[in-house]
Amino acid sequence: MTEKPTYLTREGRARLEAELEYLTTVERKQIAERIAAAKELGDISESGEYEDAKKAQALLEGRIRELKHLLSRAEVIDEDQASNGEVRVGSSVTVRFEDDGTEETWTIVGSAEANPRQGRISNESPLGAALLGKRARNKVTVHTPSGVMKLTILKVR
């Protein structure tokens, strides 16, 4: 089975690469030093310091594996490429909600960069998936866990 790509902006890929670099060169060393210091204290079978450091190490290694996996599947979005007016990953989309007339603008990004509070929604979310392939003036109905949303696309950039 082929895995889906992880869509990332250039900035998002750089951010994940920087995090991976920091975790593997700085954080990993600090945790190894904590483990060594706890071992020097003597009996590690009842050492809270040692247990805490080992838990931190396990969490760190899990995050490192996750980042490596994300980056190995990364497909960088060319945000400068013309979308021909169609919503795609990397597009900014302005919509109007039919129920109250309010407008919002979102950027469609891959799930690794999604942050709805910052206006960045995942292409895999119900809203993001419903917008993909649509154009300005299209009406869209989105089925979400909290109910049905009806909106009109005003602008695609």
Curated annotation (Swiss-Prot):
Belongs to the GreA/GreB family. GO terms for biological process: DNA-templated transcription elongation; regulation of DNA-templated transcription elongation. Residues 47-75 form a coiled coil. GO terms for molecular function: DNA binding; RNA polymerase binding. It comes from Chloroflexus aurantiacus (strain ATCC 29366 / DSM 635 / J-10-fl). Transmembrane segments: none annotated. Keywords: Coiled coil, DNA-binding, Transcription, Transcription regulation. Necessary for efficient RNA polymerase transcription elongation past template-encoded arresting sites. The arresting sites in DNA have the property of trapping a certain fraction of elongating RNA polymerases that pass through, resulting in locked ternary complexes. Cleavage of the nascent transcript by cleavage factors such as GreA or GreB allows the resumption of elongation from the new 3'terminus. GreA releases sequences of 2 to 3 nucleotides. Pfam families: GreA_GreB, GreA_GreB_N. This is Transcription elongation factor GreA. The lineage of its organism: Bacteria, Bacillati, Chloroflexota, Chloroflexia, Chloroflexales. It comes from the Bacteria. The gene is greA.
